[in-house]
């Protein structure tokens, strides 16, 4: 059906409901429904604000901010007939929000989400009839606000590249009206029936920049005089797909209240080498109203680091400006500059955000409210535990909360695991909060600094852990589309997906351990959920990738045009040859060490072997050629044996024999056996002893550390590493007050202060991969690839008395699985439950023989 022209009515639009509604209300109208047929898009076009401000010139450096202002698009429609239903299919170039008659539509935020900016946009369709006046002749106001996030901001812009330069935000939508007589009409965005302009209270908003909000301004649907004819936007020529995974929500169920709050004014102990210590003038009790005056700073501690936004209920005179600055950590040690502090002890530390003065801001200007008003940012997010609040006139804060933001909803969460050890429980909590914070439209690395990208190694090392805590199948279907969109013509996968400010350039491809996420993630989703659709969707892309690395033997030099002659490798490890620290290069400045190239080629060959084995599994599950990949895996294994290992289990590159990660990959991939294996295991045990029972591994080595030790009879070492509290270890961060997983083992050190500020996140989930081992070894719940999706469960708990007990419950694809054990004296008591339709292969501690159990609840005493 062709769209019937509708005249925009600009005069006489006076609706009390419009003026009563704030653009930051949280009670939504509109239920999300299935998308209209693709053909419906033919009734619409992309529209932008004519002469809208854009970023010009070349982007260099990290401080470039998005263009100011929010674009509003408004159409007023008179009903030709009585309406019975209305579906509105929408998408945007930039973060957009929908309003019908002043009512905010939908509970999803940050729409349309983070995708490849030029290849894919996601659409959201809502049933909006409840927000309409339905009678014939009634008028309804459809309005959209769009800000630069995901499209015209720094997150997608390479230094010196186009990206946000010249980009205009845009909207596209189709409204399907069904009338009482059964007929339908389609009304689409166009340049004749819509008005557009830069208007409203949002003065600036972007993913990295934060949000500036002036409550004195009315929303765009109330200021039609500021709007004019839009222009057609032709910047996006990609595909629009219905959103089905990766949507972002406020987690109201996890709302955080202040655990501590205080005012400070002035500093003592300041010197040339130290910022000193804040002078606290008042501490607030829980629930007490907080008052901030000019010259004072209010610090609020919510007790939990996470991706979130502050939500205020506050009051001040018209024109008062409040500035809120989030941070992950406080300055300490009298603000000693030698400790990396950026302010006095007790103040919020923001240097690790990398743009502390120009990014991650929240500025609010008060309107002439006679009473308390509410506000929270909707068009950005922050990563923080603390906020620092100042104001230029008195502000009274009746309530402030931190509202977590995530793609993991309460309904998606599937697993809980607790022990009798408080430190281990905190580590589990830190991991879960890291997942909630970083599964945000894409699996990001961190939510706080000017990065927030879909780093592919972070994703693959944590993927299996994440499947226990939440049903991530749809989330990863969406992200694997981002991976395919960003895949190179040769088949190489990127360092980040989707395309972003860095990590996905033509020389950031085929980075070992990163590129392999293109195979590892679909394999994990298939194994954990029994999902073969993800294999089918990605098979051609995975096959192209495997053919490419097989032809080149994943050799670093052969792929140097794609990898930029650099590898991240076992990122942030404490071992020799680590890349970030520069230990991979010669001390005389002559460049990369020959041993480093050997290391990179050894690791990449191991991933070639891993990838081929996973492809064989997935081929067999979907009726494809598994033998091809079995042969490829055998070829990769022989290549590693010939090139890197001696017959006695020693590495040909001598320095490998002093490291943990090379041995772990050799053991994981069964490269050694017999005496050679015994020799390697002895060297590995000795290595741990030499390092005081501390791990030395980075992102890649840590991901295989605990399972590999356990599979090779070294669960005693695995438990020593779990309980270790020295640096580096998991519990070192717990002892230092962490509430999420850190990027570095030493992101903060009690004796030395902050880690390197140029790259120092306190909310990185990668090292939370230890929880995969907790689920599969401590609790003894793992999937069997012979019958994926937990139809066949491997239950092989390995207990340790220091835990006292473990209680684990997992709502798997096959149903609820339970495993709980405890010690009573020397007696070990294990209760476990298997869901209907599933079977379990049960192996008791200290035994090797597995016994099959069918659905039911059981207790074993040993």
Where is each model-derived feature located?
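Extracellular/oxidizing-compartment recognition motifs
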Residues: 25-449, 474-475, 497-499, 533, ...
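Active-site acid/base region of carbohydrate-active enzymes
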Residues: 95, 189-198, 394-430, 436-437, ...
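C-terminal capping/lid segments that line or modulate ligand- or cofactor-binding pockets
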Residues: 142, 213, 450-451, 469, ...
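C-terminal motif of bacterial Sec signal peptides marking the signal peptidase cleavage site
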Residues: 19-20
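Non-catalytic C-terminal accessory modules of carbohydrate-active enzymes
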Residues: 163, 167-174, 187-225, 234-235, ...
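Bacterial N-terminal signal peptides that target proteins for export
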Residues: 2-9
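Alpha-helical support elements that line or immediately flank enzyme active sites
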Residues: 86-87, 309-328, 387-390, 458-487, ...
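Helix-terminus loop motifs that line ligand-binding clefts
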Residues: 107-118, 329-357, 473-590, 729-752
